[in-house]
Swiss-Prot record:
GO terms for cellular component: bacterial nucleoid; cytosol. Pfam families: YbaB_DNA_bd. This is Nucleoid-associated protein Sca_0120. Gene3D superfamilies: Nucleoid-associated protein YbaB-like domain. It comes from Staphylococcus carnosus (strain TM300).
Length: 105
């Protein structure tokens, strides 16, 4: 049974890594990132779990004759916030998977 100890050690390391990643995932739900558009006239805040928790629209961004512009600004700010949430997740979880070749991490 050569190598059995190595396999057990590897399994322990994997369990430890899974625990740390689960802890990081839990922390991410409380982390917030902000995306903005229109020079900050529209701001969207999301958690690390990509839950939108706040939308702030400056009065200057509201033009009843150009609703489409406001929609575009909200969309752009939301996409930016979601991308920042992805980056935060990759950064936080990536430190636990360094050196491993795991697709999508």
């Amino acid at each position: 049974m050569r190598g059995g100890g190595n396999m057990q050690q590897m399994m322990k390391q994997m369990q430890k890594m899974q625990k740390k990643m689960a802890e990081e995932q839990e922390k991410l739900k409380d982390e917030k990132v902000e995306g903005s558009a229109g020079g900050g006239m529209v701001k969207v805040v999301v958690t690390g779990h990509k839950e939108v928790v706040d939308v702030v629209i400056d009065e200057e961004a509201v033009d009843p004759d150009d609703v489409e512009m406001l929609q575009d600004l909200v969309l752009a700010a939301t996409n930016e916030a979601m991308n920042k949430a992805d980056e935060l997740t990759s950064e936080r979880l990536g430190k636990h998977t360094k050196g491993l070749n795991i697709p999508g991490m």
